Structures are given as structure tokens and as C-alpha cells.
Regions:
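HIT superfamily nucleotide-processing domains
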Residues: 1-93
Length: 93
């Protein structure tokens, strides 16, 4: 078993970027991508098919993390627009 969960899962085998915050539910990582300054991911620690598979309380916790990350990125980078995306189409997380 890897640090974050299952073997043979790219999101479990490595943190996925520089971990800037972590809880029992998820972690926030900064992704080093010169084309996308401020690119962050909120990554669940357990495998889920969809966000709606989370219990309501955890859904709200995850969304509060997403909103906090958005606020931090807006404050630090002052982008013209924030792009929020759910990209779990390759790896259930």
C-alpha cells in the first residue's frame, strides 16, 4: 500500500504535486506548470466514482476546501478568471 492509498494509482503513489494543505479527507497540491500559474488540485484520499458518492457532510467539507483554494489563488495570483474543473474521469478519486 502506498502513502495515500492503493497501489498502481498515480494519485495514491505520489502526492501529485507540492502538498500545501492536508486533512483526513483530502489534500491540496500545487502543480508545477509554467503555463498555468496557481494550478492547484484538491485530491481525495480515498477512491470514489463521483463526488455525489460522498456523504452530504463530506461534500460540503470538500467544497469548502475548493472555495478556500479559489480565494487563496485569487489573492496570490489575481487571475482574470478562475477555472474550476472536476477531472476524475481517468482515476476514481
Amino acid at each position: 500500500m502506498s502513502e495515500y492509498g492503493f497501489e498502481d494509482c498515480e494519485l495514491c503513489d505520489s502526492p501529485g504535486g507540492e502538498v500545501v494543505w492536508e486533512s483526513a479527507l483530502c489534500r491540496v497540491v500545487m502543480v508545477a506548470d509554467a503555463d498555468y500559474p496557481g494550478f492547484c488540485r484538491v485530491i481525495m484520499h480515498r477512491h470514489l466514482g463521483e463526488m455525489t458518492d460522498l456523504p452530504q457532510r463530506e461534500r460540503m467539507q470538500v467544497m469548502n476546501v475548493v472555495f478556500a483554494v479559489e480565494s487563496a489563488v485569487r489573492s496570490l495570483y489575481r487571475p482574470d478568471k478562475i477555472n474550476l474543473a472536476s477531472l476524475g474521469n481517468m482515476t476514481p478519486h
